[in-house]
Amino acid sequence: MSTDSTRYPIQIEKASNDPTLLLNHTCLRVKDPARTVKFYTEHFGMKLLSRKDFEEAKFSLYFLSFPKDDIPKNKNGEPDVFSAHGVLELTHNWGTEKNPDYKINNGNEEPHRGFGHICFSVSDINKTCEELESQGVKFKKRLSEGRQKDIAFALGPDGYWIELITYSREGQEYPKGSVGNKFNHTMIRIKNPTRSLEFYQNVLGMKLLRTSEHESAKFTLYFLGYGVPKTDSVFSCESVLELTHNWGTENDPNFHYHNGNSEPQGYGHICISCDDAGALCKEIEVKYGDKIQWSPKFNQGRMKNIAFLKDPDGYSIEVVPHGLIA
């Protein structure tokens, strides 16, 4: 069982040496899937890759991403959503759209802060923000507002924050011109950066891509992922995880963040995928034992060939194999 003193010094070889390992998707619960899918496809240009309905459990999953021409097919001839980068999974529990009292927790309101936002990176941020405003999209922060004038935050139908940044930056060799919109990163707040960085690097094999310290506001941002393609930058690639540390939280024994899966619910998880998810999970179990919490362990839940483990703050991470038929 993970505690505030748990450390993660042991490197998982299957994670650090597996070139097939990738940060696959981010899961958000939504109240009304028709409204939300329309929002992301019409305003941002995402495509609905797949919809999966689970009648017995009364929920549906919607998988979206920005247009890609390199998504392989699974054995059923469908897009293998678990082999792609930059996928957004929307989870709809049936009936919530008809409940006037049902409200999603967006992760940014006390006392239920934890998940922060998803981030889309664009070529021309001024043009993008102007177009979104003309289409009636609401904003939490416009470019002209706040301290940082080069980022904006749009609001999704359920109140989730969508950060908007540009990858067109002076002094960067790549990308060459516009490469379309990108699902750049997912942000979660963390209590103790030492523990979280150890976990994501040693247990899950991620690399620290960039650090951004903000002394006046007393917080630090850590950006992790499984590398940056040669023709991309850390701002134009997809599947980055941003960890936000507000200074001092690590010294408060009573402090904790909301993981999105206890009530009130909202954020669900990030998902990593690889060719042999079972072997990855087995090595983690063998080397860390009960220091890491699983719910469930690989192949032991209602849905087979998947696992969920928890990070130091209790956020869930799904582990699945490429080609999974859900």
Swiss-Prot record:
Record text on subunit structure and interactions: Monomer.
Main function: Catalyzes the conversion of hemimercaptal, formed from methylglyoxal and glutathione, to S-lactoylglutathione. Can use gamma-glutamylcysteine as a substrate.
GO CC terms: cytoplasm; nucleus
This protein's record includes keyword Lyase: yes
Domain VOC: 22-167, 182-322
Binding site for Zn(2+): H25, E89, H117, E163
Catalytic residues, chain numbering: E163, E318
Cofactor note as given: Binds 1 zinc ion per subunit.
Pathway note: Secondary metabolite metabolism; methylglyoxal degradation; (R)-lactate from methylglyoxal: step 1/2
Protein name: Glyoxalase I
GO molecular function: lactoylglutathione lyase activity; metal ion binding
PANTHER family: LACTOYLGLUTATHIONE LYASE, LACTOYLGLUTATHIONE LYASE GLYOXALASE I
Cofactors, names only: Zn(2+)
Keywords: Lyase, Metal-binding, Repeat, Zinc
InterPro entries: Glyas_Bleomycin-R_OHBP_Dase (IPR029068), Glyas_Fos-R_dOase_dom (IPR004360), Glyoxalase_1 (IPR004361), Glyoxalase_1_CS (IPR018146), VOC (IPR037523)
Entry annotated with the keyword Repeat: yes
Binding site for substrate: R29, N93, R113, H117, R147, Q148
Domain of life the protein comes from: Eukaryota
Catalytic activity: (R)-S-lactoylglutathione = methylglyoxal + glutathione
GO BP term, pick one: glutathione metabolic process
Family: Belongs to the glyoxalase I family.
Record's miscellaneous remark: Present with 2570 molecules/cell in log phase SD medium.
Enzyme Commission number(s) from the entry: 4.4.1.5
